[in-house]
Regions:
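Conserved donor-binding/catalytic core segment of Leloir-type glycosyltransferases
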Residues: 203-230, 242, 287
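Acidic donor-binding loop of glycosyltransferase active sites
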Residues: 282-297, 314
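Nucleotide-activated donor-binding/catalytic signature segment of Leloir-type glycosyltransferases, i.e.
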Residues: 251-275
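Carbohydrate-associated surface elements
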Residues: 171, 193
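A short, well-ordered alpha-helix in the C-terminal region of glycosyltransferases
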Residues: 265, 344, 351, 358-385
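Short hydrophobic beta-strand element within catalytic cores of glycosyltransferases
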Residues: 306, 311, 315-318, 328
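N-terminal subdomain of nucleotide-sugar transferases
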Residues: 1-60, 106, 160, 192
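Conserved acidic donor-binding segment of nucleotide-sugar-dependent glycosyltransferases
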Residues: 327-331, 335-342, 351-357
Length: 389
C-alpha cells in the first residue's frame, strides 16, 4: 500500500499536489493521506470530498502528546534511545510525529511513503524510515532545494536514505545531481501534471487583459510587472492588468500602483477560487510572470500558473528562471525577457497585445506543448513506477 505525507493538506497554493492525488484515485490507486498540520483555510477549495475526507490530520496539543507518547513506548530500544538523545533539539517534534504516523502506517500495511517538499514532512519521513524501515520517496520543488537551510536533518541526510528524489524540472534535476553526486542515480525528472481538458480557451476580452497570478512575494517580480504597465500606459497602450493572489507585499504593490497612477489599469484582485482562476485565464489575452532569483537563492522552478495558462492557450511573458524555459519556448509559445527589466517586459507585452495573430499562434503551440509534457495521466504513471505500483 502507498501513503502520502504532507506538511499541510489540502492547501490552496499547492493544487499540483491535489491533482496528483486525484489522478492516483482515478487510476484506482488510493493512498492513505497524512497531514502534519490543519488544512488551509484560504479560498474555497472545490475538491473531491472523498479525497479531503480521507486525510488523516494529526491531533494537536495535549491530545497529540499523549498519543505520541503511547506510540513511542512501542518503539525498539534503539529508537527510544534516539528519541531521548534528541529531546530538546529544535526538530525533536519530527521524531514524535514519526513514531505516531509510522505506527499507523504499519497497521495499514503501507510499504511506501511519498512526500512533497524537502521540509517538515520529509524530515518526518526520514525518521519513519529509521524507526519502521518504511521506504520513502520525495518530490522537491523550489525553495526547499534552492534556498540554504540549517535543519538538523538536511538534504544530505535525506538524499542518503530516500529511495528516489523527483525533481519537477530538468534544471532542478541537474542541480541536484551535481550537488549530490553520490546519489545522483536516485534523481528523476517528472513534471507536475495537469489535465488540459479542464482549461478551455475562449475569446479574450477587450481591451487586452494581462493576467498574473501568484503569492505577492519578491521572487514573483510583480513590481517589475507594475513598472512595465506604467511604461505601457505612458506609451498610450490600452490594456487592463489583474494580479490574483495575496502575500506580504500586498501593501507595497498597491502603493506602487498608486504611485504610478495606474488605478484604472491595474487591479490587485486578491486570492480567488480555482474555478474562477480558470475562467479568468480563458478571458485573458496573455499571462505575465516576470519572476526573478532572490538574494537568498529563492526562485520559481515550474510555476503552476504557467502550466494553467498554456493549457488555456495563452501566450506567456516570463523570464529564464529555474525550469521556466522548459515550459515557455521563447518565440514559439511565449516571450522570455531578462530578470528585473521592466522595459523589456513592457515591450514583450506590447508585442503580444498589438499582434493578436502572433499571440494566438503562441497560445495554440503552448497548449500543444502542455498536452505533450504535462499530461497528468502520463506523469502520474511515471511516479507509480518509482512507487513500484
Amino acid at each position: 500500500m502507498l501513503a502520502y505525507l504532507f506538511e499541510r493538506f489540502p492547501k490552496f497554493s499547492q493544487t499540483f499536489c491535489y491533482r496528483e492525488i486525484a489522478e492516483l484515485f482515478r487510476q484506482d490507486v488510493r493512498p492513505a493521506i497524512f497531514s502534519l498540520r490543519a488544512p488551509d483555510r484560504g479560498p474555497e477549495l472545490n475538491w473531491d470530498p472523498a479525497i479531503v475526507s480521507a486525510v488523516h490530520q494529526l491531533p494537536e496539543g495535549d491530545a497529540f502528546a499523549r498519543l505520541a507518547d503511547e506510540a513511542s513506548a512501542t518503539l525498539s530500544r534503539a529508537a527510544r534511545r534516539t528519541l531521548h538523545e534528541w529531546r530538546g533539539k529544535d526538530d525533536s517534534l519530527r521524531l514524535h510525529q514519526a513514531a505516531y504516523i509510522g505506527a499507523r502506517l504499519q497497521k495499514l500495511g503501507v510499504r511506501h511513503l511519498h512526500v512533497h517538499f524537502a521540509g517538515m514532512a520529509a524530515r518526518t519521513a526520514f525518521w519513519i524510515k529509521r524507526f519502521f524501515e518504511i521506504e520513502y520517496s520525495l518530490t522537491v520543488h523550489a525553495n526547499d532545494i534552492f534556498v540554504p537551510n540549517n535543519f538538523e536533518i538536511g538534504l544530505l541526510q535525506i538524499f542518503s536514505t530516500v529511495r528516489a528524489v523527483v525533481a519537477v524540472s530538468d534544471f532542478a534535476a541537474k542541480q541536484l545531481r551535481d550537488r549530490f553526486s553520490d546519489t545522483a542515480s536516485r534523481v528523476h525528472r517528472i513534471y507536475n501534471g495537469i489535465d488540459c481538458d479542464n482549461f478551455q480557451p475562449a475569446e479574450p476580452s477587450r481591451p487586452a487583459l494581462i493576467l498574473s497570478i501568484g503569492r505577492l512575494i519578491n521572487k514573483k517580480g510583480f513590481d517589475v510587472l507594475i513598472d512595465a504597465c506604467a511604461s505601457l500606459r505612458n506609451g498610450n497602450q490600452e490594456f487592463r492588468c489583474e494580479i490574483i493572489g495575496e502575500g506580504p507585499l500586498s501593501a507595497d504593490m498597491q502603493a506602487r500602483i498608486e504611485r504610478h497612477g495606474l488605478g484604472k489599469q491595474v487591479l490587485l484582485a486578491g486570492p480567488r477560487p480555482q474555478a474562477e482562476i480558470a475562467a479568468r485565464l480563458s478571458r485573458a489575452t496573455l499571462l505575465a510572470l516576470p519572476c526573478r532569483v532572490d538574494a537568498d537563492g529563492a526562485m520559481d522552478n515550474l510555476p503552476t500558473v504557467i502550466m494553467e495558462a498554456m493549457a488555456s492557450a495563452l501566450p506567456v511573458v516570463s523570464t529564464d528562471v529555474g525550469g521556466v524555459a522548459e515550459m515557455v519556448r521563447n518565440g514559439e509559445t511565449g516571450l522570455l525577457v531578462n530578470q528585473n527589466d521592466p522595459i523589456a517586459t513592457a515591450e514583450a507585452l506590447r508585442r503580444l497585445i498589438t499582434n493578436p495573430e502572433l499571440a494566438q499562434s503562441f497560445g495554440r503551440k503552448g497548449r500543444e506543448h502542455a498536452k505533450e509534457i504535462f499530461s497528468i495521466d502520463k506523469n502520474v504513471r511515471a511516479l507509480r513506477q518509482i512507487f513500484a505500483l
